[in-house]
A protein has these predicted regions:
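Catalytic domains of cell-wall/extracellular-matrix polysaccharide-remodeling enzymes
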Residues: 49-50, 73-174
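Active-site beta->alpha N-cap acidic-glycine motif
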Residues: 1-78, 82, 86-93, 98-100, ...
Length: 174
């Protein structure tokens, strides 16, 4: 699994899980555009079905779209065939909507095991984890989330945030 990318430049990857979640997604897209920042959105398949216009808005804004499973169940609790179904179903939904298949996957809760690795290898998708976690599902104060990220951030870090938790635009803007 990829948890960071070795870089000398002061560059990090902003990633957002669990979307799309209108109206949070739109507010997040506006904030990212104001700051000239692109991000990777790891989308849940059931949200792709429910909010196709938000998925299209994310893609049209130039952000990368990754697969975050269909139902957001922990992959470790699923059979090999159920894992594969979660991956394929979500990738198919995204491809049918956007004309492009996602190439990245982030497991729900960051949990993975040998069965998931086998399924991802079969589908040619890397697992993208994170090494900087804003814990924005526990904390709603944007300043505390931002400080948590900034106290340990380094070039090449992959930062985990969520589309739809708390004041979504504040930590990224800071």
């Amino acid at each position: 699994a990829v948890v960071s990318v070795p870089l000398d430049e002061k560059v990090v990857a902003l990633t957002y899980d669990d979307g799309p979640n209108p109206p949070h997604t739109q507010a997040l897209l506006e904030m990212l555009a104001q700051h000239g920042v692109t991000a990777t959105f790891f989308l849940k398949g059931r949200n792709v079905e429910a909010f196709p216009e938000s998925v299209q808005a994310v893609a049209q804004a130039g952000h990368e779209i990754g697969n975050h499973s269909y139902s957001h169940r922990p992959m470790l609790s699923l059979s090999q065939s159920a894992m594969r179904e979660e991956l394929v179903r979500t990738s198919d939904l995204i491809e049918n909507l956007l004309g492009q298949r996602p190439v990245l996957f982030r497991p729900p809760y960051g949990l993975q095991g040998p069965g998931l690795k086998m399924a991802l290898d079969e589908l040619g998708m890397p697992s993208i984890l994170m090494n900087s976690n804003g814990a924005d599902w526990e904390e709603t104060d944007p300043e505390l989330i931002t400080n948590k990220i900034l106290e340990s951030i380094a070039p090449g870090d992959i930062i985990l945030l969520h589309d739809g938790h708390g004041d979504v635009d504040e930590p990224a803007a800071q």
